[in-house]
């Protein structure tokens, strides 16, 4: 039986293979972070993980250094970002631009606190379409024409 690494030693990312359950679980989670409305759901449902006080009082915002749940989740997000941004792993992302942008933004304590605000989510949702790289080979002729008109 495999022993887990000591708590002070960072965990190694799972091998990038779709037959590895941990890899597919983390792929599904980071892929869901590309959806701003999922980020909003996390902020509303699990505010303690993001360092948000449920009362909504900005003066009482939890500090990551004092909340072990927020501290652990921030460390987990940093761990995920450290390897999903590499080409070896990013190739598996359906929406790499939006996913990696969300992971990068989630590294910031202020962003983790601010995503509970609807205006932040709406701005993030508005940038998703423009930020996604377009793969011309995957587009049909009609969609390309519509994109040209929008430009």
Curated annotation (Swiss-Prot):
Segments for region (Disordered): 1-20, 131-151
Regions of compositional bias (Pro residues) in chain numbering: 1-18
Single GO BP term: regulation of DNA-templated transcription
Broad class of the protein's primary localization: nucleus
Pfam families: Med31
Molecular function as annotated in GO: transcription coregulator activity
Keyword Nucleus: yes
Subcellular location: Nucleus
Gene Ontology CC terms: mediator complex
Keywords on record: Activator, Nucleus, Transcription, Transcription regulation
Keyword Transcription applies: yes
Residue ranges the record marks as coiled coil: none
InterPro entries per record: Med31_sf, Mediator_Med31
Self-association and partners: Component of the Mediator complex.
Family annotation (PANTHER family): MEDIATOR OF RNA POLYMERASE II TRANSCRIPTION SUBUNIT 31
Family, per entry: Belongs to the Mediator complex subunit 31 family.
Summary of the function given for this chain in its UniProt record: Component of the Mediator complex, a coactivator involved in the regulated transcription of nearly all RNA polymerase II-dependent genes. Mediator functions as a bridge to convey information from gene-specific regulatory proteins to the basal RNA polymerase II transcription machinery. Mediator is recruited to promoters by direct interactions with regulatory proteins and serves as a scaffold for the assembly of a functional preinitiation complex with RNA polymerase II and the general transcription factors.
Protein name: Mediator of RNA polymerase II transcription subunit 31
Gene name of the record: soh1
